[in-house]
Structures are given as structure tokens and as C-alpha cells.
Design a protein with these regions (language model features):
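Conserved N-terminal beta1-alpha1 strand-loop-helix module at the mouth
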Residues: 1-110, 117, 142, 156-178
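Flexible glycine/serine/alanine-rich "lid" or loop that lines and gates the nucleotide-sugar donor pocket
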Residues: 77, 127-128
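Glycine- and Gly-Pro-enriched alpha-helical subdomains that act as flexible
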Residues: 87, 108-121, 127, 133-137
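Hydrophobic/aromatic ligand-binding patch that stacks against planar heteroaromatic rings
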Residues: 102, 124, 151
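Bateman (tandem CBS) regulatory domains
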Residues: 131-132, 179
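Conserved catalytic cores of soluble enzyme domains
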Residues: 134-136, 140, 144-157
């Protein structure tokens, strides 16, 4: 029986096929003053990545009518270290346009929260204004994890590695990540 992650990855493969060959022009976007890592180090305490999420496969609809721009402004005004924007539509009802809109109004780092399985998704995230991308260890084999991690770093993006167990943590630690 397929897991939710399996179903999501099937959809991501379809999405990647549509994205391949496209070019993503980075528009003039508001840049964060500091990286997420710099913010955390300067605060010398745990930082908060505040999330904009309309829905999830496990919870269903969470906040279908959320205005990502207003939510981002509220998060930034209340001390969020970064903002996570769900960009997956089929399962989370987010979009890359949400990320673009948020980037226009805040100057803190933005995490593109999606199921990244290909470099083209990283290119799209960067062009939309993301400063951080998410790599989920459970969704990638070691070779792909390393390839995408290194590519994102080459693009001057921060990488948040998501792990759910000790085995995934060991796999991710071989990359010497700054954010787990």
C-alpha cells in the first residue's frame, strides 16, 4: 500500500516533467538582510520558522482562506526568524505564487517548503525569491540527496534537511549540513 509520501512523490515526478525545459527569471525581489543561519547565531537562541499552510494530507483543510501576504507580515512583525511557504498544490493547496507574493513584502529568509526531487524545482524556488529550500531525507536516496544539496549550495541557497529517524539523520550528517 502506497504511503502519503509515495503518492506525493508520484505527483512531484509529473510536476518535474512539466517544469523541465522552462527558464525561471528572477525578478527584482526584496532580499533578506541576513541568512537564517546568521539570524539564529546572532539571537543565540532557537529561531522560529513560521509556516503558511492551507491544508495537509493528514489534517485536511487548515486555513483555506489564508492571505499569505498578510500572514507573512504578521509573522515578520512578531519576530519570526524565517517564513515557510508551502508551494505544493495537490496536497497542501499552496503555490509558487504564494512564495513570490510573500517575498515582495518581507525581508527575512523564506523557506520554499515542497518535496524537492529535481534541480529544476530549486531553480524555480530561487527565482521566486526563496532563500532556503527543504530536502526531505525520506524522499531521496543518498545520491540524489547529495546532488540536490550541493546544487542548492552552489545557487547560494540555504538548505534545511528534514529527518524523521536516526538512520535519516546519519545519512544527512554526511553532507555536513548547517540546518537540520
Amino acid at each position: 500500500m502506497a504511503t502519503i509520501l509515495d503518492k506525493i512523490l508520484v505527483e512531484k515526478e509529473k510536476e518535474v516533467k512539466k517544469l523541465i525545459g522552462q527558464t525561471f527569471n528572477q525578478t527584482a525581489v526584496r532580499k533578506p538582510k541576513k541568512t537564517f543561519k546568521q539570524i539564529i547565531e546572532e539571537q543565540n537562541k532557537m529561531g522560529v520558522i513560521a509556516e503558511i499552510k492551507r491544508a495537509s494530507p493528514s489534517k485536511g483543510t487548515i486555513n483555506a482562506d489564508v492571505d499569505p501576504v498578510q500572514q507573512a507580515i504578521t509573522y515578520a512583525a512578531n519576530g519570526a526568524s524565517a517564513i515557510s511557504v508551502l508551494t505544493d498544490y495537490p496536497f497542501f493547496k499552496g503555490s509558487i505564487d504564494d512564495l513570490k507574493a510573500v517575498r515582495e513584502v518581507v525581508d527575512i529568509p523564506i523557506l520554499c517548503k515542497d518535496f524537492i526531487i529535481d534541480k529544476v524545482q530549486i531553480d524555480r524556488a530561487k527565482a521566486a525569491g526563496a532563500n532556503i529550500i527543504l530536502l526531505i531525507a525520506a524522499a531521496l536516496d543518498d545520491t540524489k540527496l547529495k546532488e540536490l544539496y550541493e546544487y542548492a549550495k552552489e545557487q547560494q541557497l540555504e538548505v534545511l534537511c528534514e529527518v524523521h529517524d536516526e538512520e535519516a539523520m546519519e545519512r544527512v550528517l554526511t553532507l555536513k549540513p548547517e540546518i537540520v
